[in-house]
Amino acid sequence: MIIYPSIDKLLEKVPSRYSLAVLAAKRAHELESGDLKMLSDYKSDKSVGKALEEIAAGDVIIDPKSKMLERDAEKLDRKDQE
């Protein structure tokens, strides 16, 4: 169960719970792979908790350009399958 940061604070930074879950998972994977940490101090010891703390701090956001690229790639995949 998430105590810190609160889900309400996180949803101020991300438009939906689904987007929050995906963003946190991707960032946690980056942290586990050795990516640089964006905060100097974390309350959580786990990578998902650290990712959520970075999201709450506003240091990790959803890149609108990457969302557009993903949509374009999905459209191309659909056309290729037809």
Swiss-Prot record:
Which reaction is catalysed here? RNA(n) + a ribonucleoside 5'-triphosphate = RNA(n+1) + diphosphate
- Keyword annotations for this protein? DNA-directed RNA polymerase, Nucleotidyltransferase, Transcription, Transferase
TM spans (from-to): none
- Name the Gene Ontology biological process terms: DNA-templated transcription
Q: Which domain of life is it from?
A: Bacteria
Q: Which SUPFAM superfamilies match?
A: RPB6/omega subunit-like
In the Enzyme Commission scheme, what number(s) does this protein have? 2.7.7.6
Record Pfam families: RNA_pol_Rpb6
Q: Which GO terms describe its molecular function?
A: DNA binding; DNA-directed RNA polymerase activity
Gene Ontology terms, cellular component aspect? DNA-directed RNA polymerase complex
InterPro entries from the UniProt entry: DNA-dir_RNA_pol_omega, Pol_omega/Rpo6/RPB6, RPB6/omega-like_sf
Q: What does this protein do?
A: Promotes RNA polymerase assembly. Latches the N- and C-terminal regions of the beta' subunit thereby facilitating its interaction with the beta and alpha subunits.
User: What family does the Swiss-Prot or TrEMBL record give for this protein?
Assistant: Belongs to the RNA polymerase subunit omega family.
Assembly and partners are described as: The RNAP catalytic core consists of 2 alpha, 1 beta, 1 beta' and 1 omega subunit. When a sigma factor is associated with the core the holoenzyme is formed, which can initiate transcription.
Q: What is this protein called?
A: DNA-directed RNA polymerase subunit omega
Q: From which source organism is this entry?
A: Lacticaseibacillus paracasei (strain ATCC 334 / BCRC 17002 / CCUG 31169 / CIP 107868 / KCTC 3260 / NRRL B-441)
